[in-house]
Amino acid sequence: MKVYCLLLVLLVGLVSQAHGQLDKKCQMVCTFDYRPVCGSDGRTYPNKCTLTSTACMSQRSITVFHDGEC
């Protein structure tokens, strides 16, 4: 039982560290300028920076499908 608890603690630590590295990699300062873009996922984003940040944090490939709302 102690071994399982130790493994669980180590696993949680590794996942937390990986998530922290992702946060640092995806850290962006986006402005509040409203220049909507339609993402390849069918969602409207306030601007390209927000789309790029969302794609990075979700680890998905989201590109600008076209300018303007979807």
Curated annotation (Swiss-Prot):
Q: What is this protein called?
A: Turripeptide Gsp9.3
| Keywords linked to the UniProt accession | Disulfide bond, Ion channel impairing toxin, Neurotoxin, Protease inhibitor, Secreted, Serine protease inhibitor, Signal, Toxin
SMART domains referenced in this protein's UniProt entry, alphabetically: KAZAL
Any one GO biological process: cell differentiation
| Annotated site residues (Reactive bond) in this chain | 32-33
Where the protein is mainly located, per its record?
secreted
Q: What is known of its domains?
A: The cysteine framework is IX (C-C-C-C-C-C).
InterPro entries hit by this protein: Kazal_dom (IPR002350), Kazal_dom_sf (IPR036058), Prot_Inhib_GrowthFact_Antg (IPR050653)
Species annotation: Gemmula speciosa (Splendid gem-turris)
